[in-house]
Curated annotation (Swiss-Prot):
This is Uncharacterized protein YxeC. The keyword Cell membrane applies. It is found in: Cell membrane. The chain crosses the membrane at residues 18-38, 50-70, 71-91. Keywords: Cell membrane, Membrane, Transmembrane, Transmembrane helix.
């Protein structure tokens, strides 16, 4: 069963950001969390992206062995974290897209009503007529 009502194909299409968490040694893992946080306006994921970036940068500037002891566990943590937040991201993206689509529909309807001087109808009236 899918996470959203949009289906598995939509969910996998909108999970492409997970490719960033699989890049070796967490090189782009921080970008994945920044992307999903910005996309659905989730400050917590943006903060994780920033934190992961600073941890990666710190591990990258250290000498070889200490840096490896920071970067490799970070890579594992970001992979686990990515799989954990994927369902939450997809749900939030679904709700966000529903809101954007509903607003676009309402704007198009309002524009058409004003262009054709039609009386304004509520969306509930339209759904009632459609069901009858």
């Amino acid at each position: 069963m899918g996470i959203t009502k949009r289906g598995a194909a939509w969910e996998w299409l909108h999970s492409w950001w997970m490719l960033f968490i699989f890049m070796p040694f967490a090189i782009t893992s921080f970008f994945a969390f920044l992307f999903i946080g910005i996309k659905v306006r989730n400050r917590k994921w943006i903060m994780y992206g920033i934190i992961y970036f600073f941890i990666f940068a710190f591990g990258f500037v250290l000498p070889d062995l200490p840096g490896v002891f920071i970067v490799v566990p970070l890579w594992a943590v970001t992979i686990i974290h990515g799989f954990k937040v994927r369902p939450l991201y997809l749900i939030q993206l679904d709700v966000y897209k529903d809101h954007v689509e509903a607003r676009a529909f309402a704007e198009a309807r309002s524009e058409a009503e004003s262009r054709f001087h039609a009386p304004k109808q509520s969306i509930q009236d339209i759904h009632i007529r459609k069901e009858q």
